A protein has these predicted regions:
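Active-site neighborhood of divalent metal-dependent phosphoester bond hydrolases
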Residues: 39-125
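N-terminal active-site segment of His-dependent metallophosphoesterases
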Residues: 1-49, 59
Length: 125
């Protein structure tokens, strides 16, 4: 019988992810249940860590509503930015672009920057 270790709703908190992973035995199937991004201080580090675990350890990663909002914003930044911003998107955008979390965000221009500068992470999501 397969054992599973599931993690969800990390919301950009890399430290919390590291703490949770300390409880994983390394043998159980690791499953991420989505909502890896938004609100927290380091969505980029969370995505990089989870992507590495998927590629190197065979972890499974499901998308949550926050990943969906992120991708919707990238597809149509003019229409979707306000909704995404209200759900913690600015912290993810700034984290991905390597800026201070309180830096101003420019919905359309930053969508292009995220697509260009973090294409591997966007593809992963």
């Amino acid at each position: 019988m397969t054992k599973y270790f599931a993690i969800g709703d990390v919301h950009g908190k890399a430290g919390m992810l590291d703490e949770l992973l300390q409880h994983w035995d390394g043998h159980s199937q690791l499953v991420f249940l989505g909502d890896l991004i938004d609100r927290g201080e380091d969505s980029r580090a969370v995505l990089e860590r989870v992507k590495a675990l998927v590629e190197q350890e065979g972890a499974v990663c499901l998308s949550g509503n926050h990943e969906y909002m992120f991708l919707t914003w990238l597809d149509n930044p003019e229409k979707s930015y306000d909704h995404y911003r209200r759900n913690g998107g600015d912290t993810t955008i700034n984290s991905l672009l390597g800026r201070p979390l309180n830096a101003p965000v420019y919905g359309v221009a930053d969508a292009e920057g995220v697509k260009t500068e973090t294409a591997d992470l966007v593809d992963f999501i």
